[in-house]
């Protein structure tokens, strides 16, 4: 066998292996929607946004973590950002909801973790905010902390997350590429009966529609009948009945950030569209699911100063008529972020020997190929 033939055989056998090792949906030629993703296809494509994660994967039964999302690099309490929260199904323990609903702004990093670690995360965020320069006189802080219940794989009753873990996630937050799958707050989560986790995606609007970026990050821990690019994957795999075993205490946290100048009213409208993205994947917002969407505008011109001598606030706001492209971007990015969390997931064994298999990507890709959904 000559050298050229040997190299050809090597590539013939190794390329399928490399392809299946790739962890994101688009790496396999599957495109969701019609809008273009950002450079990284992550929430950090939104200028200034930072994400930090702390993964706690120890011993036989600790499978949990922290994911922190910072809308900008400054003092968020002193420079608040417009925000809204939409509740798709309210079986959850989202801290900070009522003040965001009332005032329409966010004043801390957004933290995602497990259900029983919400109080710990709130304490950590309060401490972090109090210690920021210029916050010496602050007496009230609205920490926003979301959660899903990772108790099937994780010893959630052990409450292993500490304030130091939360602070590490915040302090290590950065722009640029980020990890997906079984990392951070997604370490022990389950989605459609397969290993879920953290997923992210982004969309950039055409210049004629404003050129704005929408980024989405999800923590997937919910059930339903999985669909990928419109293909009934869960039904074809005969796996959908298994997904309901894990859904009663499941949830999906969705964080939508955009540099479009939006007020809290239109941010709530934007947040509602994330639920449409969830439904495109086969999610059903079950009785026991806490499906929350946190939407934030990072536009610098829209920031809200903590203190101001001017009682009138002049803030640029996108007109209602310009919202439709942003709605589409949110739907597409949410759908792809959820699927990315599944494609990045790896089989995991956790508490009491419980085992959750990764999505069988080979079988899924073959179904998509047969349905004509692959670009290559």
Task: Locate each region found by the language model.
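Alpha/propeptide regions of enzymes that mature by internal proteolysis
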Residues: 22-376
């Amino acid at each position: 066998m000559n050298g050229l033939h040997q190299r050809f055989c090597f590539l013939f056998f190794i390329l399928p292996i490399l392809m299946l090792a790739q962890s994101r949906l688009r790496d396999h030629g599957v495109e969701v929607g019609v809008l273009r993703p950002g450079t990284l296809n992550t929430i950090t494509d939104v200028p200034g946004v930072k994400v930090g994660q702390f993964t706690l994967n120890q011993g036989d039964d600790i499978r949990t973590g922290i994911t922190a999302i910072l809308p900008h690099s400054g003092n968020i309490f002193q420079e608040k950002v417009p925000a809204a929260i939409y509740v798709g199904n309210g079986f959850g323990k989202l801290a900070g909801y009522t003040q965001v609903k009332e005032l329409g702004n966010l004043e801390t990093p957004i933290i995602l973790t497990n259900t029983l670690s919400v109080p710990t995360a709130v304490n950590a965020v309060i401490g972090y905010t109090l210690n920021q320069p210029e916050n010496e006189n602050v007496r009230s802080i609205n920490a926003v902390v979301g959660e899903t219940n990772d108790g099937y794989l994780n010893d959630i009753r052990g409450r292993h997350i500490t304030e130091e873990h939360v602070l590490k996630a915040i302090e290590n937050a950065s722009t640029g590429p980020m990890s997906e799958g079984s990392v951070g707050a997604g370490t022990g989560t389950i989605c459609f009966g397969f290993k879920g986790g953290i997923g992210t995606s982004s969309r950039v609007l055409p210049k004629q529609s404003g050129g704005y970026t929408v980024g989405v990050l999800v923590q997937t821990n919910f059930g339903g009948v999985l669909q990928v690019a419109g293909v009934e994957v869960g039904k074809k795999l005969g796996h959908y009945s298994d997904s309901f075993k894990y859904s009663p205490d499941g949830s999906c946290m969705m964080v939508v950030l955009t540099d479009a100048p939006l007020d809290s009213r239109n941010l709530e409208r934007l947040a509602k569209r994330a639920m449409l993205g969830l439904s495109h994947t086969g999610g059903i917002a079950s009785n026991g699911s806490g499906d929350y969407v946190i939407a934030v505008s990072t536009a610098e011109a829209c920031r809200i100063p903590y203190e101001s001598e001017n009682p009138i606030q002049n803030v640029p706001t996108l007109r209602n008529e310009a919202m439709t492209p942003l709605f589409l971007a949110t739907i597409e990015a949410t759908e792809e972020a959820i699927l990315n969390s599944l494609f990045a997931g790896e089989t995991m064994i956790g508490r009491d020997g419980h085992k959750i298999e990764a999505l069988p990507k080979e079988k899924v890709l073959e179904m998509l190929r047969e349905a004509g959904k692959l670009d290559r």
